[in-house]
Amino acid sequence: MLTNRQLLILQVIINDFIQSAQPVGSRTLSKKDEITFSSATIRNEMADLEELGFIEKTHSSSGRIPSEKGYRYYVDHLLSPVKLTKTDLDLIHSIFKEKIFELEKTVQKSAQILSDLTNYTSIVLGPTLSENYLKQIQIVPIQPDKAVAILVTNTGHVENRTINFPAKVDLADIEKLVNILNDRLAGVPMDELNERIFKEVVTYLRQHIANYDSILESLRSTFHPAAHVEKLFFGGKINMLNQPEFHDIERVRSLLSLIEKEQDVLKLFQSSKAGISIKIGKENDYEEMENCSLITATYTVDTKQIGSIAIIGPTRMNYSRVVSLLQHVTSDLSKAFTSLYDE
């Protein structure tokens, strides 16, 4: 159990190191307004903190830097949110100012603005298409035996799918088909369309379209549930180059190589808990990230988690600021998506 004096010294060391990236010595601490102890007391307390594993000495300096254990204690017990500036809030609110809300643009903009505000790398995992509901479908003939189905979801996502008809289909039948699909499938989750067609829509096709069986077969391949593609949006991929810890080219190259592998990036989100989650240094699953911290946050529709945001930075990350930004952005995203999904 750390004493109040040790807690204060640890907090000041970490806050100073976050800002300066320079080892912190007793002389630096003695100049801090909140530190009122003698230099001898500071040195003794620092020695105890080092012995306990919360700070460590670097080879090139007499000062101390936080250890992973120190950062973990700081995050778990000493972290307090910071008040965001008007500039911060204006930038965040600009994400949602578009009159026409489009899922992909909004998520992409969130990634970019978070990277701008933190100067770290941001990754946003957007909702999968299966989380969307069909709002409208149009079918546009492009050849006698081919058409394009235009699917619009409740979140503004637009997807084109090709329909290959086995024989010439009458335009009047296509019009009937569109009316039936819109009437029976509007509001149905995208990954349930195929099932609904063969359980329910088939009855209406049989009643109203002569060669319904050939059209039904065409719909089977068109609306077959695709794999749930999880879409990633990045901001500031090379921001790590601005951090002193990553002036080592080999270190940053291995990290950038990891970020380019989509499946590896997706794994970063797999163990994310609801809300805010923080992994520090070797707590991360990849060796390439042992000098990094990863902060993830989830956003929801009502209480259902539909996406996540990750910020990757050095272990010397400004945790308070990043957590405050993520809380604000995920709250706004949750409200925006909830209003869309409830329409």
UniProtKB/Swiss-Prot annotation:
> Which residues, if any, are the signal sequence?
none
Spell out the family assignment given in the record's similarity comment: Belongs to the HrcA family.
Keywords, A to Z, come to: Repressor, Stress response, Transcription, Transcription regulation
Q: Which organism is it from?
A: Bacillus velezensis (strain DSM 23117 / BGSC 10A6 / LMG 26770 / FZB42) (Bacillus amyloliquefaciens subsp. plantarum)
Entry-linked PANTHER family: HEAT-INDUCIBLE TRANSCRIPTION REPRESSOR HRCA (PTHR34824:SF1)
Lineage: superkingdom: Bacteria
**What biological-process terms (Gene Ontology) are attached?**
negative regulation of DNA-templated transcription
Q: Which Pfam families match?
A: HrcA
GO molecular-function annotation terms?
DNA binding
Q: What is this protein called?
A: Heat-inducible transcription repressor HrcA
What does the protein in this record do?
A: Negative regulator of class I heat shock genes (grpE-dnaK-dnaJ and groELS operons). Prevents heat-shock induction of these operons.
